[in-house]
Amino acid sequence: QTKFWQTGMIECGVKYGLSSTNNHMTTDSIFNDIPLSQTPQDFRYDEHVAAAYISVGKQFGEHWSVKLGLRGEYTYSFGNWLSADSVTRRSYFNPFPTAYIGYTTSPLGNLQQPIAVSASYTRRIKRPNYWMLNPFRTYVDAYSYQEGNTALTPEFNNDVELHFSWTQYLNVTFNFAHTQDMFSQKTTILPDGMGYTKWINFGTCTTHGGNLSLTELPLVPKYVTAEDGTKTMQGAWLALTVNAGWFHFINKSYEKNAEGKSAYENRTHYGYVGGTLSAYLPKDWTLTFDGNWSSPMTTGYNKQGSMYFLSFGVRKMYMPKGLIFNLNIQDLARSLSMVDKSEGMAPGYESWHENYVRQQRVMLSITWMFGQYQQHKNRKVGNMDELNRLGGGGGVQTGN
């Protein structure tokens, strides 16, 4: 990176990533201690991603800032899916532009900005997780199974945001996004009644909506009296943090009906709200109460049910000794459950499952700070994108 015209900055860089998976696995079917069959799961998958980017930013006066950027990515992938007796090769290049313009009523660099407004545009790529590509068949029960899709291609997202902030407390964001080749799982009913679920590039998803967040808004301010008798606010006895949003979804499948229109189209709404109420008591005691709720949401062929979650925490600090005691109680109402339903199936069929996640727990932690504290900034570079695509298990999974 280099500066120009005092307040301008040019940055450029390159990145190369290689991921290679060589999987050998055999699944044994056993009934009454008698081996029935062996199913191999052998494949080799290599992916090369080469990228280069350049961005130019400039401050104009004390209130305006502009930034433009462009990233180009070339991808080559090879998959030898031995168990499925198929080979896939892909080679493609994609540009990803970005643009940003911002205005503040106070000089740039002032942390106590009274009002700030910005607008941005970004284009992103999301490659399928490796387990989405794995064609290995996983049986859910005697009448259904699921598998990956070696022909799955990346999805692309175009996002436009208008952001407004007031001091350090209030942030409001209006968002419009359009996703192409969106990932979704589709359940198909076979003539024998067996159902199978497979990852596909569903189609497009268009969303628009907004988000509002309040950060540590003082409900009961704490005042400090100076020697001359003047009072100034310093923190709060009771503070509220809230994050809420509402979005409208339009899902359209690439699959067409006899009239040439999308065979499946769904228009739904989605909303969520979460908040934390913090009480800062004398002698460094802190009480927190957290609550989160989200409405049902439909993306592609998949519909998720609503859920809510409650937690409570107590913290005690002994600053002279550098000791911090934390007691947290999660899922107070034992309410955390997830309901998923498959849409767009054959008439007369429906598929849904409910998963109860037992997250109710009590955690006690003790932190002792000593010596000189130094904050280290971790920069995410290299293979972070590839690691995220491995899934929670840290390796290639056979299902979702």
Locations of the language-model features?
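Gram-negative outer-membrane beta-barrel transporters
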Residues: 202-292
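Repeated loop/turn-to-beta-strand initiation elements of outer-membrane beta-barrel proteins
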Residues: 5-10, 63-66, 106-111, 115-117, ...
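Face-selective signature of the C-terminal outer-membrane beta-barrel domain
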Residues: 1-80, 106-110, 207-245
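Outer-membrane beta-barrel signature, preferentially recognizing the C-terminal barrel domain
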Residues: 41-45, 125-178, 197-220, 353, ...
